[in-house]
């Protein structure tokens, strides 16, 4: 996947980071904000390995539908590129130019690290659930429900996490 995203370092060192939320009982929840929804993340979900992930279909749709929001939030500074991502993926295109050579190295890294976590969860039998700020519960997005500070959407969020939980045989 690293090479498919344009990775060019002969001996890359990866650091996908920690999980967003580790719950009692071993459930891990990743809450993905707007910077996770773009063509690079969609590319990582195209393989056969991802077909049974409960978030693949909605995430691929959101990558297409919300890439413009990703661009708005992530076309500048370290959200577009940084020295460590350039070591992995090479020089970036001009900020905002995803069709240019290099694209957005930081976006590629984020997509790769999400993919690595997904693959690891599949391989290791980890109970991972991914939800998106763009997911809809009741009449609003998860982001709006979380920002409200109200507890009125707690059960809807719990239900979404349960629906997106990776189940292993």
Which positions does each model-derived feature cover?
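Nucleic-acid endo/exonuclease domains
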Residues: 1-169
């Amino acid at each position: 996947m690293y090479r498919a995203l344009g990775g060019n370092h002969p001996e890359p060192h990866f650091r996908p980071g920690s999980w967003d939320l580790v719950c009692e009982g071993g459930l891990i929840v990743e809450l993905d904000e707007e910077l996770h929804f773009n063509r690079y993340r969609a590319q990582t979900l195209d393989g056969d390995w991802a077909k049974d992930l409960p978030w693949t279909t909605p995430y691929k749709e959101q990558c297409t539908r919300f890439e413009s929001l990703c661009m708005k939030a992530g076309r500048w500074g370290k959200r577009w590129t940084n020295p460590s991502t350039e070591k992995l993926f090479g020089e970036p295109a001009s900020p905002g130019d995803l069709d240019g050579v290099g694209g957005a190295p930081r976006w590629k890294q984020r997509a790769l690290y999400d993919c690595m976590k997904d693959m690891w969860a599949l391989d290791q039998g980890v109970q991972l659930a991914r939800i998106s700020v763009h997911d809809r519960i009741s009449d609003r997005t998860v982001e709006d429900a979380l920002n409200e500070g109200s507890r009125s959407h707690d059960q809807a969020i719990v239900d979404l996490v349960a629906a997106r939980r990776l189940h292993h045989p």
